Amino acid sequence: MIPNRSTMRGRGAASSAGTRGRLRLVVACCAIATLLVASACSTKANNNNSSGKSGGPNSVKTDIGVTDSTINLGILTDLSGVFAVLGKSVTQGAQLYFADLNKKGGVCKRQIKLNIQDDGYDVQKAVGIYADMAPNVLGFEQLLGSPINAALKQNIETDKAFTIPVSWASTILDNPNNMIVGTTYDIEMINGIQFLVDQKKIKAGDTIGHIYLEGEYGEDGYLGSKFAAKKLGLKLVGQKITATATDVTSQITALKNEGVKAIMLTATPTQTASAAAVDASIGLNVPLLGNNPVYAPQLLETAAGPALTKLLYVAASWQPYSGTTPGATKVRDAYSAKYPNEIPNGGVPWGYGAAAAYTAVLQKACENGDLTRDGMQKAFRQTTSIDTDGILPALDYSHPGDPATREVLIAQPDKASKGGLKVVQDLKASDLANQYVAPQHGKGG
């Protein structure tokens, strides 16, 4: 449901405590094919308040990014690149939540202030922006993009910057500073394939295809397909593509020649539109199942719209914009009032729910009297269950390194639904998903 890319990097405007390190070649998970990141800088910077000094109200201990009146949080996102639709919508969702929270007094008698920066889903640019932002924020309420999160993994660990990745790759579950809001790409795919079996669209012995991006995003989705195919007696044929590809005709044609009965997608929205159009035009007409970032409602206005409506299913662990839970309804009402002329998508409720999850940790840190970065990490480990009023399933963070939920809903493109998606199967975790153990599970903490 949430499609788009971002990037991140860090450069020296951080502080004298920042250290330059080599960054490896980062393969864009949802974005630019391959980017060489020259260097990254860890930012263990000083704040206006020294660590251990009273933060004012309630004598709360503070350090980086927190003053007597303000909690500064970073949002490093994509507002101009391939995942700009997603980046904009999740940011708007967060802004709605924090605006309402601030009207009610904020957290710990402090207002939440967001520092929002656009990296255009460029990894090198993101690393540099991160270095500039990190000395001035308590943590990152959003860090968009699997390749960017991978590039900044060591920086975030060293800086102890509590972060919500706008990425659902299981490969970053082992970072103790990351709070993944929702389930991971591999589990989305496992639940989705089980759905196709349950709906008798595929069966044991069938061949299925998977078109996936090189990098953390695509390969995590493919990991789920491999597990499900093995357990369900399916033959899997993979087709790896780069993030810059816009036409997947050759991949769909190759899969048709393999006799596939369904095609999985861990790709960009543009690639999804191409896949659906070709699937229909060459007479294949098999169902397509995608991870949450594969779709944007704007695609319904393209020539691929009818094929998407007929063939595509999207797996995600939160309500679409058209969701009917109390939380989803509240978000929709607030968004339509604030942005009456915008085209909404599933990123809006996720952004709102993620902000609520981050706030739950802030509130726990306040209760503990410690709004430092160390205090946030401690509070996170004590926040074992988060309720977002039905936007997401209950989120359980009591098992470091494991996904907070394994529940997924299935939605289909629908022009008549607000946000362009309708739910066809409510949130549930399949037995198959509950059996699954990813390589990083249990390693966080």
How would you name each of these model-derived features?
Residues 58-59, 85-92, 104-173, 241-248, ...:
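Beta-alpha junction/loop-to-helix N-cap segments that form part of ligand/metal-binding clefts
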